[in-house]
Regions:
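Amphipathic alpha-helical interaction segments
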Residues: 12-13, 84, 105
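Intrinsic disorder/low-structure terminal segments
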Residues: 3-4, 17, 75, 92, ...
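Extracellular/luminal ectodomains and secreted, surface-exposed scaffolds of diverse proteins
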Residues: 89-109
Protein backbone atom coordinates (compact mmCIF):
# COMPACT_ATOMS: atom_id res chain seq x y z
CA UNK A 1 0.00 0.00 0.00
CA UNK A 2 2.84 2.32 0.75
CA UNK A 3 4.13 1.72 -2.76
CA UNK A 4 0.71 2.67 -4.09
CA UNK A 5 0.65 5.90 -2.13
CA UNK A 6 4.22 6.67 -3.13
CA UNK A 7 3.42 6.11 -6.83
CA UNK A 8 0.25 8.22 -6.54
CA UNK A 9 2.10 11.00 -4.76
CA UNK A 10 4.90 10.89 -7.34
CA UNK A 11 2.37 11.02 -10.20
CA UNK A 12 0.59 13.96 -8.58
CA UNK A 13 3.90 15.75 -8.05
CA UNK A 14 4.88 15.24 -11.69
CA UNK A 15 1.46 16.46 -12.90
CA UNK A 16 1.76 19.53 -10.71
CA UNK A 17 5.27 20.22 -11.98
CA UNK A 18 4.08 20.18 -15.59
CA UNK A 19 0.99 22.28 -14.83
CA UNK A 20 2.88 24.86 -12.78
CA UNK A 21 4.67 26.51 -15.73
CA UNK A 22 1.34 27.00 -17.54
CA UNK A 23 -0.17 28.69 -14.51
CA UNK A 24 2.94 30.77 -13.88
CA UNK A 25 3.04 32.25 -17.37
CA UNK A 26 1.69 35.78 -17.48
CA UNK A 27 0.60 36.69 -21.03
CA UNK A 28 -1.10 39.98 -21.85
CA UNK A 29 -2.25 42.02 -24.80
CA UNK A 30 -3.95 45.33 -25.41
CA UNK A 31 -7.24 46.33 -26.92
CA UNK A 32 -7.64 49.89 -28.12
CA UNK A 33 -10.99 51.57 -27.73
CA UNK A 34 -11.69 54.37 -30.21
CA UNK A 35 -14.62 56.59 -31.01
CA UNK A 36 -15.54 59.99 -32.37
CA UNK A 37 -18.18 62.58 -31.60
CA UNK A 38 -18.87 64.80 -34.60
CA UNK A 39 -19.21 68.54 -34.11
CA UNK A 40 -22.87 69.52 -34.12
CA UNK A 41 -24.10 73.09 -33.70
CA UNK A 42 -27.74 73.98 -34.33
CA UNK A 43 -30.13 76.78 -33.50
CA UNK A 44 -33.90 76.81 -33.56
CA UNK A 45 -35.42 80.27 -33.99
CA UNK A 46 -39.02 80.93 -33.03
CA UNK A 47 -40.62 84.17 -34.27
CA UNK A 48 -43.42 85.03 -31.85
CA UNK A 49 -45.17 87.18 -34.49
CA UNK A 50 -45.39 90.20 -32.18
CA UNK A 51 -46.54 93.61 -33.38
CA UNK A 52 -44.69 96.54 -31.83
CA UNK A 53 -46.50 99.57 -30.41
CA UNK A 54 -44.32 102.23 -32.00
CA UNK A 55 -46.10 105.41 -30.88
CA UNK A 56 -46.31 104.25 -27.24
CA UNK A 57 -42.91 102.55 -27.36
CA UNK A 58 -41.81 99.13 -26.16
CA UNK A 59 -39.43 98.15 -23.40
CA UNK A 60 -37.72 94.77 -23.72
CA UNK A 61 -40.67 93.20 -25.51
CA UNK A 62 -40.00 89.54 -26.27
CA UNK A 63 -40.38 89.06 -30.02
CA UNK A 64 -38.70 85.68 -30.44
CA UNK A 65 -36.70 82.94 -28.80
CA UNK A 66 -33.66 80.98 -29.84
CA UNK A 67 -32.62 77.53 -28.66
CA UNK A 68 -28.90 76.85 -29.09
CA UNK A 69 -27.20 73.46 -29.02
CA UNK A 70 -23.49 73.12 -29.75
CA UNK A 71 -21.15 70.40 -28.50
CA UNK A 72 -17.93 72.30 -29.21
CA UNK A 73 -15.73 72.11 -26.13
CA UNK A 74 -14.04 75.38 -27.07
CA UNK A 75 -17.34 77.26 -27.40
CA UNK A 76 -19.02 78.93 -30.34
CA UNK A 77 -20.41 82.28 -31.50
CA UNK A 78 -23.96 83.47 -32.12
CA UNK A 79 -24.34 86.39 -34.53
CA UNK A 80 -27.21 88.84 -34.77
CA UNK A 81 -27.68 90.95 -37.88
CA UNK A 82 -30.30 93.46 -38.98
CA UNK A 83 -31.38 93.83 -42.61
CA UNK A 84 -31.81 97.60 -42.04
CA UNK A 85 -28.83 98.29 -39.73
CA UNK A 86 -30.93 98.39 -36.57
CA UNK A 87 -33.78 100.49 -37.93
CA UNK A 88 -37.43 99.76 -38.58
CA UNK A 89 -38.18 101.09 -42.08
CA UNK A 90 -41.24 102.32 -43.91
CA UNK A 91 -40.11 103.57 -47.30
CA UNK A 92 -37.52 106.27 -46.56
CA UNK A 93 -38.65 106.73 -42.95
CA UNK A 94 -36.91 104.94 -40.09
CA UNK A 95 -37.32 104.30 -36.37
CA UNK A 96 -34.33 103.25 -34.28
CA UNK A 97 -34.62 100.31 -31.92
CA UNK A 98 -32.38 98.23 -29.68
CA UNK A 99 -32.26 94.51 -29.04
CA UNK A 100 -31.41 92.46 -26.00
CA UNK A 101 -30.16 88.92 -26.54
CA UNK A 102 -28.57 87.22 -23.56
CA UNK A 103 -25.36 89.21 -22.89
CA UNK A 104 -25.80 91.66 -25.81
CA UNK A 105 -27.81 94.86 -25.56
CA UNK A 106 -27.64 97.55 -28.21
CA UNK A 107 -28.47 98.67 -31.70
CA UNK A 108 -27.75 96.31 -34.57
CA UNK A 109 -26.01 98.96 -36.67
CA UNK A 110 -23.53 96.21 -37.52
CA UNK A 111 -23.40 92.50 -36.83
CA UNK A 112 -23.37 91.67 -33.11
CA UNK A 113 -21.55 88.62 -31.76
CA UNK A 114 -22.36 86.71 -28.58
CA UNK A 115 -19.48 84.45 -27.51
CA UNK A 116 -20.17 81.15 -25.78
CA UNK A 117 -17.12 79.95 -23.86
CA UNK A 118 -18.11 76.28 -23.83
CA UNK A 119 -20.63 73.77 -25.10
CA UNK A 120 -24.33 74.45 -24.52
CA UNK A 121 -27.25 72.09 -24.87
CA UNK A 122 -30.78 73.43 -25.39
CA UNK A 123 -29.80 76.90 -24.16
CA UNK A 124 -32.85 79.11 -24.62
CA UNK A 125 -32.50 82.89 -24.95
CA UNK A 126 -35.18 85.45 -25.76
CA UNK A 127 -34.76 88.21 -28.32
CA UNK A 128 -36.22 91.39 -26.85
CA UNK A 129 -36.79 94.76 -28.52
CA UNK A 130 -36.92 98.28 -27.11
CA UNK A 131 -38.41 101.12 -29.17
CA UNK A 132 -38.59 104.67 -27.79
CA UNK A 133 -42.07 106.22 -27.69
CA UNK A 134 -42.72 109.25 -29.92
CA UNK A 135 -45.67 111.28 -31.18
CA UNK A 136 -43.57 112.37 -34.16
CA UNK A 137 -43.19 109.11 -36.05
CA UNK A 138 -44.39 109.31 -39.66
CA UNK A 139 -47.41 107.09 -40.50
CA UNK A 140 -46.59 103.81 -42.20
CA UNK A 141 -45.92 100.11 -41.78
CA UNK A 142 -42.42 99.68 -40.36
CA UNK A 143 -40.37 96.49 -40.44
CA UNK A 144 -36.91 95.01 -40.14
CA UNK A 145 -35.58 91.46 -40.16
CA UNK A 146 -33.14 90.19 -37.55
CA UNK A 147 -31.13 87.13 -38.54
CA UNK A 148 -29.65 84.92 -35.81
Amino acid sequence: MTKFFAKTAAAALIATAFAAPAMAQNASGTIQLKGNVALSCTIAVQDLGQSLSLKNGESNKTVGSVTETCNSGSGYKITLASANAGKLKSGNFTIDYQVNYDSFTGALTSQAVVDRANAQFNKRSDLKVTVPASDQYIAGDYADTVTV
